[in-house]
Amino acid sequence: MTRPYAPGYRIPTDLLLKAYASGVFPMAESASDPEVFWVRPETRGIIPLDGFHTPKSLRKTIRKSLFDIRFDFDFEATIDGCAEKREERRSTWINAPIREAYVQLHRMGHCHSVEAWREDQLVGGLYGVSLGRVFFGESMFSKETDASKICLVHLVERLKARGFALLDTQFTTEHLKRFGAVDVPRGKYEKMLAEALKGEAIFFP
């Protein structure tokens, strides 16, 4: 992992979009740390859209229609859900400057959420950045079993339907590998990124 730029306390949206187009993204050491640093990993996590796999057990859950899936219905609640500390996740990298920057990107039409609702309560979701034909997944959360996983399935369905070419997960986890996530070297990723930035795909509406 490299940090190509000096830390800062604010992220201008024009700089943030240029960073994503260059294969760079911001993080913070913790939610309480006011500084932001920039990351350009040696290997990058992606989910090939044509290789996405929905586990059999999850397909059964999806058929039960337990959740109302909404897009961009309450973006700020979704990013706050991702930032919330939980028993299984005691720390988070979403600090105040990051939240502010992504809320602004959402207002500009470059950041979107997929949300799972149940009885008018937000119980899971994810958000990410849309640029060109690329969707950069940022974070997800669940308050009910499988809520964020089902949001991921709906995300991929929308990306395919809307003509997206690349789903960037930044890093891979065992959880994401169950859905087909793979690591690619930085050089290969940046070529894929450059190609996918050609043209425009509309995530919402």
From Swiss-Prot:
The gene is aat. GO terms for molecular function: leucyl-tRNA--protein transferase activity. This is Leucyl/phenylalanyl-tRNA--protein transferase. Keywords: Acyltransferase, Cytoplasm, Transferase. The keyword Transmembrane helix does not apply. It holds the Pfam family Leu_Phe_trans. PANTHER family: LEUCYL/PHENYLALANYL-TRNA--PROTEIN TRANSFERASE (PTHR30098), LEUCYL_PHENYLALANYL-TRNA--PROTEIN TRANSFERASE (PTHR30098:SF2). Its EC number is 2.3.2.6. Belongs to the L/F-transferase family. HAMAP family: Leu_Phe_trans (MF_00688). SUPFAM superfamilies: Acyl-CoA N-acyltransferases (Nat). Its main location: cytoplasm. GO terms for cellular component: cytoplasm. Functions in the N-end rule pathway of protein degradation where it conjugates Leu, Phe and, less efficiently, Met from aminoacyl-tRNAs to the N-termini of proteins containing an N-terminal arginine or lysine. It comes from the Bacteria. It is found in: Cytoplasm. It catalyses: N-terminal L-lysyl-[protein] + L-leucyl-tRNA(Leu) = N-terminal L-leucyl-L-lysyl-[protein] + tRNA(Leu) + H(+); N-terminal L-arginyl-[protein] + L-leucyl-tRNA(Leu) = N-terminal L-leucyl-L-arginyl-[protein] + tRNA(Leu) + H(+); L-phenylalanyl-tRNA(Phe) + an N-terminal L-alpha-aminoacyl-[protein] = an N-terminal L-phenylalanyl-L-alpha-aminoacyl-[protein] + tRNA(Phe). GO terms for biological process: protein catabolic process. It is an enzyme of class 2 (transferase).
